[in-house]
Amino acid sequence: EAMLPRDERADVGGIGGTVAANVLSLAAMRATLGEVLTDDAFVHMISLGARFEAGVADAIERHGLPWHVTRLGCRVEYLFRAERPRTGSDAAAGGNPELDRLIHLYALNRGILLTPFHNMALMSPATTEADVDLHSGVFDEAAAELAERGAYV
């Protein structure tokens, strides 16, 4: 127990270290950049990011929740607070670990895996509109249940 992180927001799952740039990793990186992350793939991923953002924003507005969603290209994240953080410190201070865990478990029980440590999704070349729409429906259900119970802050 003495070795456990004291801060629930501690990043214990990052990737790094001296062996992160080995030959296999570099070959995989080169293949990904040359064969997977093409211009067409980015058009697809960014379009899905906009769709994901719209689904989350619609649920937040429809249920009157003091939350927000932010998108940068194909990366979309929602935070359970009204104000958008301006710095990393703002984001950390505005976290809600209990609500984060709840939404992750709620989504996981319905077939959706969110990025660990925050409520973020990255659209990939393999992501489909059906994947995004599934998340939008599940997020809307969770938002409705939380709003109904007043358990959203």
Where are these regions (language model features)?
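Conserved N-terminal phosphate-binding loop of PLP-dependent enzymes in the Aspartate aminotransferase
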Residues: 1-153
